[in-house]
Every structure is written in structure tokens, then in C-alpha cells.
Amino acid sequence: MSRAYDLVVLGAGSGGLEAGWNAAVTHKKKVAVVDVQATHGPPALVALGGTCVNVGCVPKKLMVTGAQYMDLIRESGGFGWEMDRESLCPNWKTLIAAKNKVVNSINESYKSMFADTEGLSFHMGFGALQDAHTVVVRKSEDPHSDVLETLDTEYILIATGSWPTRLGVPGDEFCITSNEAFYLEDAPKRMLCVGGGYIAVEFAGIFNGYKPCGGYVDLCYRGDLILRGFDTEVRKSLTKQLGANGIRVRTNLNPTKITKNEDGSNHVHFNDGTEEDYDQVMLAIGVPRSQALQLDKAGVRTGKNGAVQVDAYSKTSVDNIYAIGDVTNRVMLTPVAINEGACVLLETVFGGKPRATDHTKVACAVFSIPPIGTCGMTEEEAAKNYETVAVYASSFTPLMHNISGSKHKEFMIRIITNESNGEVLGVHMLGDSAPEIIQSVGICMKMGAKISDFHSTIGVHPTSAEELCSMRTPAYFYESGKRVEKLSSNL
């Protein structure tokens, strides 16, 4: 049976666009990509390019960069730059306008891609499954809303990403999410970021850098330590440095109720009995975006928080339906979604050469202030998987901060190895340039680098990165899952 389309992609994010473009260009397939709007901003906020381009990585990195100038200006005095720092203040509106201009240009480039690519078409609306080979495009997420068109297809790719969710407490409708934070008219004077993940931590840095005079930023997290899943010592050091930067990190704390004050600000009740007023409360809690896709109509199985269940090749419980990216809740990173999209459509489905994305040793970054770069296992993960593990640790004050006046800004590097053969299992860094350094480290680790390879490499001086080549003595070990200062002599 001949169908109207070879492939329908739900979601025009990085992974979906990679898959759709490859199918159309490399394999000459007829492809339809469905998403809610073409250009960023209200009402849907997300558009061509997905979360990353519109309300994620790209605009957030621009805003973090802007926020870093607060410290650079303050620290420049030690290097001889004389100015009236008290009179300097950031202009939030200028930042947002500049950010919007960049995002607009990316949206336009994707529009041109659709216009210039034979066999690739964009369909605006909310896509949902009618059955395993039919996608309906509606006016809204409401399953009873008007149907704009119906797409008949051989294959379906679900690439709808993740989406902010609510707390589920009274008054949480008064809160904004990280999506709306990109479109605030003014920087809040009193800001609360709710969550302990990278989005909350990154936005805390942004709002701290752009807060009006006399303002403050709080970050509250229900757990003991922010950034669960990252290296423990890096998390502790970042928490300390955030505090030194003026951000109050409040752990084991969660809002239980939010009410509106007469002046429009938010009155927040916390689980420890305290109460506080904030101009804005931002929720940074995300879940896979699958709730409105009507996956049950095609028999597609989902798991915790609506994550689409897939095998190693990104195939769902239905043979002709695949899913990639955040909606599968595997490794929720844009480059991973792009790789998954290429593997699924370029090679597995239309290429006839099944290939799975390797989700191990994926380098990533947290653009906090200061930032984190990480790749591979934490020491706890390594200790569960290997009999003997060595942990190399170093922290130091980068050269510039001997003059800048910010000696609290330590650079931390931690290397985790399999002690039996020296293989580098994980590298974790905190400090300026850590995200740039970790990319090269990730390549080394993917090639199977050993700690001896690091030791035999001549470092670039003077840099923070050269410390990777100088860490020759383990700080401690793990043996049979337990931390020890030295290994048993019989090993």
C-alpha cells in the first residue's frame, strides 16, 4: 500500500529536524514535520528548532554570558580598569531584544531549509496519533479541537522533547516556568528559582547577574544537594560558590502554597513553616512531552512521567514508530537527540544498517556561574561497576583570580579511573572554561584513554586545563564498593 508520506515527524526540535532532513535529502523520502508554530514567542513559545533554539540552550547560553559580565566588571579593577562601577547597571530589555534577534535568525534559517529542501514540508499545528500510520494535526492540544489535516504515513518519529510542569500545590498557577522566563519584561528584584537541576541553577545565575539594585535570588530544592547525578564534590563546591556570588541556596525546602499580595508579588509558604515574598517564582521542573499525543491509540507504551519506551535503536512498542530525544528520558541533551535522529532515520530505518546511539561517555556542561564540565561516570557509579577505582582530585585558584579579588573561585578537576587497567571512566570539572575543556576530554575518553595517556601529555601553560596532565597520585580509592585510603596489598 502506497502512503502519502514516508515519514511524519512530531516535533521540530534538533533531533526531529536532523531526522527529517536526512530522510528527505539522503534517502529522497517524502517527509512531513509537525509543530505548533514556526517562529518563537507567545502563545506557544517553542517553534522551529525546538526547546534548544527557542527556550533552552541557545538563548540561555546568551543570557548566562551576559550575566557573567557582572563579575568581569567587578574584577577588572584589579587589572587596572578604573570606572564608576556603582553607576553601572544591566539593561534586561536590551538583553532580551538581542536574544530574540538571534533566535529569530535561527527560526528563519529553518524556514529556508523547508522551502529549499525537496520532499520536506512543515505542518503547523498540534500533532497526535490516530493509529499507527495516521497523524492528525489539530488547532490545539485539546483532542476535540478542529482537525487541520490528516497525514497518512509509513513511519512516525516522536520527537516532542520535554516540557515544564507544575508543582501541584495551591497557587502554583501564579508561578512562571523556565519557558516564560525568556520573555519577562523586567528582571525581578526578588526571585525564587524552584528546582535543583541544571535549569534552575543556570537561571539563578542569570537572574543574579541582572537583578536590580538591592535585589536577591533564592534557589530552593527539596533534596539535600543540588544537581543530583553529578559529581558530589563538584556539587558541594558549586553550592559554596553560588553562595559567595550572592545566591542563597536553600535545600530540603519546597513551596507548599503560593498566594498573591496586593502589589502583585507572590507570598510563598515553605514546608519548614517559613514564608517569604518574591516578585517572581520560576519552576524548573520538566517531564517528557507526550501527554497530548494520544499514543495509546497506536499502542505506543510509555513509562514514568510519560517517557516513551524504546529499545536500543529508538524503536517503540510499535514496529513503525520510533522516538528520540527528551521524550524518551534517556540522556536529555540536544546533541544526543541529533545523534539519535541520524541513527534512526539515516541508518536504521532507511539505510538498512541498524545503529544505536552510544549513550556512554557523553560530555556535557552546566552553564552555571561558575560552569561545570563532565563526562562519564561519577565515583559512586564507578564503584558499583568496577572492583577497584582510583579517584584523582585537584582544586586550585586560577591565575587570574590572584589579581581579580575572587579567590573563592576555585577550579576543581576530578578524574575517575579503573585502577586495574588505568582506563579513564569519568572526568568532572568546575570553573571557567570547564565546558570548553570537557569536549576534548570526551573525545579522549571515547577513544579509550588511560590515565597514563594524560600523564604522558605535555600541558599548555599557564592554563587550568594543564592540571589534567599533572594529577599523578590518587587522592583515594574504592575497593569492592567501599572508599579506602589505599588498596589491599593482595590486589
Curated annotation (Swiss-Prot):
<dbReference type="GO" id="GO:0006749">
    <property type="term" value="P:glutathione metabolic process"/>
</dbReference>
<keyword id="KW-0285">Flavoprotein</keyword>
<dbReference type="GO" id="GO:0015042">
    <property type="term" value="F:trypanothione-disulfide reductase (NADPH) activity"/>
</dbReference>
<dbReference type="GO" id="GO:0005739">
    <property type="term" value="C:mitochondrion"/>
</dbReference>
<dbReference type="GO" id="GO:0005829">
    <property type="term" value="C:cytosol"/>
</dbReference>
<dbReference type="InterPro" id="IPR004099">
    <property type="entry name" value="Pyr_nucl-diS_OxRdtase_dimer"/>
</dbReference>
<dbReference type="InterPro" id="IPR012999">
    <property type="entry name" value="Pyr_OxRdtase_I_AS"/>
</dbReference>
<dbReference type="Pfam" id="PF02852">
    <property type="entry name" value="Pyr_redox_dim"/>
</dbReference>
<comment type="subunit">
    <text>Homodimer.</text>
</comment>
<dbReference type="InterPro" id="IPR001100">
    <property type="entry name" value="Pyr_nuc-diS_OxRdtase"/>
</dbReference>
<dbReference type="InterPro" id="IPR046952">
    <property type="entry name" value="GSHR/TRXR-like"/>
</dbReference>
<comment type="similarity">
    <text>Belongs to the class-I pyridine nucleotide-disulfide oxidoreductase family.</text>
</comment>
<protein>
    <recommendedName>
        <fullName>Trypanothione reductase</fullName>
        <ecNumber>1.8.1.12</ecNumber>
    </recommendedName>
</protein>
<dbReference type="GO" id="GO:0050660">
    <property type="term" value="F:flavin adenine dinucleotide binding"/>
</dbReference>
<feature type="disulfide bond" description="Redox-active">
    <location>
        <begin position="52"/>
        <end position="57"/>
    </location>
</feature>
<comment type="function">
    <text>Trypanothione is the parasite analog of glutathione; this enzyme is the equivalent of glutathione reductase.</text>
</comment>
<keyword id="KW-0560">Oxidoreductase</keyword>
<dbReference type="InterPro" id="IPR036188">
    <property type="entry name" value="FAD/NAD-bd_sf"/>
</dbReference>
<dbReference type="GO" id="GO:0045454">
    <property type="term" value="P:cell redox homeostasis"/>
</dbReference>
<dbReference type="GO" id="GO:0034599">
    <property type="term" value="P:cellular response to oxidative stress"/>
</dbReference>
<feature type="active site" description="Proton acceptor">
    <location>
        <position position="461"/>
    </location>
</feature>
<keyword id="KW-1015">Disulfide bond</keyword>
<dbReference type="InterPro" id="IPR023753">
    <property type="entry name" value="FAD/NAD-binding_dom"/>
</dbReference>
<keyword id="KW-0963">Cytoplasm</keyword>
<dbReference type="InterPro" id="IPR016156">
    <property type="entry name" value="FAD/NAD-linked_Rdtase_dimer_sf"/>
</dbReference>
<keyword id="KW-0521">NADP</keyword>
<feature type="binding site">
    <location>
        <begin position="35"/>
        <end position="52"/>
    </location>
    <ligand>
        <name>FAD</name>
    </ligand>
</feature>
<dbReference type="GO" id="GO:0004362">
    <property type="term" value="F:glutathione-disulfide reductase (NADPH) activity"/>
</dbReference>
<dbReference type="Pfam" id="PF07992">
    <property type="entry name" value="Pyr_redox_2"/>
</dbReference>
<keyword id="KW-0676">Redox-active center</keyword>
<dbReference type="InterPro" id="IPR001864">
    <property type="entry name" value="Trypnth_redctse"/>
</dbReference>
<keyword id="KW-0274">FAD</keyword>
